[in-house]
């Protein structure tokens, strides 16, 4: 029996693939559990259309991420924090703080998960920060942490 997989099935195939399986396996396991549907040309067209929509969505997401990254790389972003005499920060600068501060200055909507920090920043100075945006867009931006007046 020909089936179209609705999910990835180990040792059978990936979502959207058309596979030939035994009738019993399809009727007793794959179809009742929602892993597959019986093959029809209409269903195949619908799945191809769905894949095309998903592909376009990912492409738009990547383009949007590239625009955001281009805007982020234009300048060194300044984050002002309260600090003591030795350049030690009261508290720490986290990814959430960076996203919030950079959003204020650029007007872009940023997510804290896009900023990759090994550990929170605890001293004043300049830092290169890895940014990983949706759509697989990655690069580094410059951050300068300054004392708040």
Swiss-Prot record:
UniProt entry tagged with the keyword Acetylation: no
GO biological process, one term: translation
CC terms in the record's Gene Ontology section: ribonucleoprotein complex; ribosome
One protein family per Pfam: Ribosomal_L9_N
Gene3D superfamilies for the chain: Ribosomal protein L9, C-terminal domain, Ribosomal protein L9, N-terminal domain
Keywords, comma-separated and alphabetical: Ribonucleoprotein, Ribosomal protein, RNA-binding, rRNA-binding
Gene Ontology molecular function: any one: structural constituent of ribosome
Function: Binds to the 23S rRNA.
Family, per entry: Belongs to the bacterial ribosomal protein bL9 family.
Name of this protein: Large ribosomal subunit protein bL9
Originating organism: Thermotoga sp. (strain RQ2)
């Amino acid at each position: 029996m020909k089936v179209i997989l609705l999910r990835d099935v180990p040792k059978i195939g990936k979502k959207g693939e058309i596979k030939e399986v035994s009738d019993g396996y399809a009727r007793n396991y794959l179809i009742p559990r929602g892993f597959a549907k019986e093959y029809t040309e209409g269903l195949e067209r619908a799945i191809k259309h769905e894949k095309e929509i998903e592909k376009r969505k990912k492409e738009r997401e990547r383009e949007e991420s590239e625009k955001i990254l281009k805007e982020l790389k234009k300048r060194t972003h300044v984050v002002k924090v309260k600090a003591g005499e030795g350049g030690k920060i009261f508290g720490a600068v986290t990814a959430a703080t960076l996203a919030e501060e950079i959003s204020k200055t650029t007007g872009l909507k940023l997510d804290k998960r896009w900023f990759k920090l090994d550990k929170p920043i605890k001293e004043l100075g300049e830092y290169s920060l890895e940014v990983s945006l949706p759509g697989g867009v990655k690069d580094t931006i410059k951050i300068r942490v300054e004392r708040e007046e």
